[in-house]
Amino acid sequence: MLFRSGNHFGYEGMQLTEPAQFTEYPKGGFYDWHMDADVNGQFEPPVRKISMTILLSNPSEFEGGDLEFMTEGNKPPQLLQGQAIFFCSMIRHRVNKVKKGVRRSLVMWFGGPPFK
């Protein structure tokens, strides 16, 4: 999947940039709008270019906690437990406030040399 995603976005030499991150959002938990990419050039290469989120929780076990993208026609993806979504790390995104239950996910970043 990573190679297809990298080719789709036109990136070469993709690699895992850091260890995977387990995230847990209990009731009231959220993560506001942000980009995963280092747009200010503060981090050493490899730079994040593709982000991936795997939903670990069963969607029936929590309410809210939608992964949203700041794009035209913003419609949150409806992931099932164990499904992954890949997206460009420069796209602003957030996790809405969890209203009930706990949302768990695994997040990974893939990158390569700095953009030219």
Show where each model-derived region lies.
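Fe(II)/2-oxoglutarate oxygenase catalytic core
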Residues: 1-84, 90-116
